[in-house]
From Swiss-Prot:
Region (Flexible loop): 98-108
First-level EC class: transferase
Residue sites binding Mg(2+) per the record: D16
Protein name: S-adenosylmethionine synthase
Pathways involved: Amino-acid biosynthesis; S-adenosyl-L-methionine biosynthesis; S-adenosyl-L-methionine from L-methionine: step 1/1
Keywords: ATP-binding, Cytoplasm, Magnesium, Metal-binding, Nucleotide-binding, One-carbon metabolism, Potassium, Transferase
Organism for this UniProt entry: Cytophaga hutchinsonii (strain ATCC 33406 / DSM 1761 / CIP 103989 / NBRC 15051 / NCIMB 9469 / D465)
Self-association state and partner proteins as the record states: Homotetramer; dimer of dimers.
General function of this protein: Catalyzes the formation of S-adenosylmethionine (AdoMet) from methionine and ATP. The overall synthetic reaction is composed of two sequential steps, AdoMet formation and the subsequent tripolyphosphate hydrolysis which occurs prior to release of AdoMet from the enzyme.
Residues engaged in binding L-methionine: E55, Q98, D251, K282
Length: 419
């Protein structure tokens, strides 16, 4: 029987995402100047205030206030009427040295024996319902907000947009678990106070449907069939009406509160650990990326149509407690999920140091992950600039989203005898 499934996303200007982006900007700066830095950084943003707190073990000393201001500036909080503005907000730092008790569980004489930074379980998921092996509802929800932010920055077709926004997409699936149509789209965007509430609502609704949606269809042709007009999509645009007060002034934001937006939109599973603000010694982050890498390569290799991969750790122990695989009955090989897991365990070294090396995670690559999802993004090589506390500028050439590479497809096919 057909069923509905929904996923949501939030924009870079959403308060929780502002916090994530500040935390990850600090991670990047520490790693740029000290690749061996151990960092756990949490951020709180509210009306006119930013609070930074966390633990650090590093040789680098940073101007954390200026780094935070630059992130806020880049997002677009640059006007005093937002009640949260890059140049004038107060920034309090309570960042201190990492506990020696925690560090002794991670550091080892041999790097290969580096222990997990904490206990826990992490999940990776992939499906062939989109070209980037991500759930379609989440992919669409992200794309809506990416293009909405682009329209805001361009400031031509829609001039009243402010940084805070949310989207939600509901899809109908058929009996074979394939998406067949979009049932509903919910989009709420912060905006200037430019007319009466009724006129603003009508204008925003019209612009989203007549400007944003055609832009999505034009830029992402693969989604054209879902907007062909054959089935009526229910649109709920700013359903509460006026949305002038938003961002950190409207809601307090915290690092790590959008973990489902960051991953698979409710598909698969989540171990509960957030990513942003954590260096790669924290397996909450590194192992989640590694399991996504495994899942994506398994599906791309034709092993299955959909897969969930779990790995678990004990703090201070390098070898995982176990690896679990669930192909949801879609496996194309004559092996059960337990047998598949055994081969996966041999194929992918899941010790923390091995993950760091395989995915090049000791590089400043995290700011780009902090909005619009950590998964399903395009791997690319970029050159990034970082400014030290004494004004020194260094440039780093890094590869982003390495866990999205399909570099193990041939190895998977060989290991499972897939032709």
């Amino acid at each position: 029987m057909p069923y509905l499934f929904t996923s949501e996303s939030v924009s870079e200007g959403h308060p929780d995402k502002v916090a994530d982006q500040i935390s990850d900007a600090l991670i990047d700066h520490f790693l740029a100047f000290d690749p061996n830095a151990k960092v756990a950084c949490e951020t709180l943003v509210t009306t006119g205030q930013v609070v930074l707190a966390g633990e650090v073990k590093s040789k680098a000393y940073l101007d954390v206030q200026e780094i935070a201001r630059e992130v806020i500036r880049k997002i677009g909080y640059t006007k005093s009427e937002y009640m949260f503005e890059a140049n004038s907000c107060g920034i309090f730092s309570a960042i201190h040295e990492q506990s020696a008790d925690i560090n002794q569980g991670v550091d080892r004489k041999k790097k290969e024996e580096q222990g997990a930074g904490d206990q826990g379980m992490m999940f990776g998921y992939a499906t062939n319902e989109t070209n980037d092996y991500m759930p379609l509802a989440l992919d669409l929800a992200h794309k809506l907000l990416i293009e909405l932010a682009a329209l805001r920055r361009e400031g031509k077709q829609i001039k009243y947009l402010r940084p805070d926004a949310k989207s939600q997409v509901t899809l109908e699936y058929d009996d074979n678990n394939r998406p067949v149509r979009i049932d509903a789209i919910v989009l709420s965007t912060q905006h200037d106070d430019f007319d009466t509430e009724e006129k603003m609502h009508k204008k925003i609704e019209k612009d989203i449907v007549s400007i944003l949606i055609p832009r999505i269809v034009s830029k992402y042709p693969k989604y054209k069939k879902f907007f062909d007009g054959k089935t009526k999509i229910k649109y709920h645009i700013n359903p509460t009406g006026k949305f002038v007060i938003g961002g950190p002034h409207g809601d307090t934001g915290l690092t790590g509160r959008k973990i489902i937006v960051d991953t698979y939109g409710g598909k698969g599973a989540h171990g509960g650990g957030a990513f942003s603000g954590k260096d790669p010694s924290k397996v909450d982050r590194s192992a989640a990326y590694a399991t996504r890498h495994i899942a994506k390569n398994l599906v791309a290799a034709g092993l299955c149509d959909e897969v969930l991969v779990q790995v678990s750790y004990a703090i201070g122990v390098a070898k995982p407690m176990g690896i679990y695989v669930n192909t949801y009955g879609t496996a194309k090989v004559k092996k059960n999920d337990g047998e598949i897991a055994k081969i996966v365990e041999k194929l992918f070294d899941m010790r923390p140091y091995a993950i760091e090396q395989r995915l090049q995670l000791r590089n400043p690559i995290y700011s780009e992950t902090a909005a619009y999802g950590h998964m399903g993004r395009k791997p690319e090589t970029v050159t990034k600039s970082f400014k030290s506390n004494d004004g020194k500028i260094i440039k780093k050439k890094v590869e982003l989203f390495t866990w999205e590479k399909l570099d193990y497809v041939d190895k998977v096919r060989k290991a499972f005898g897939i032709k």
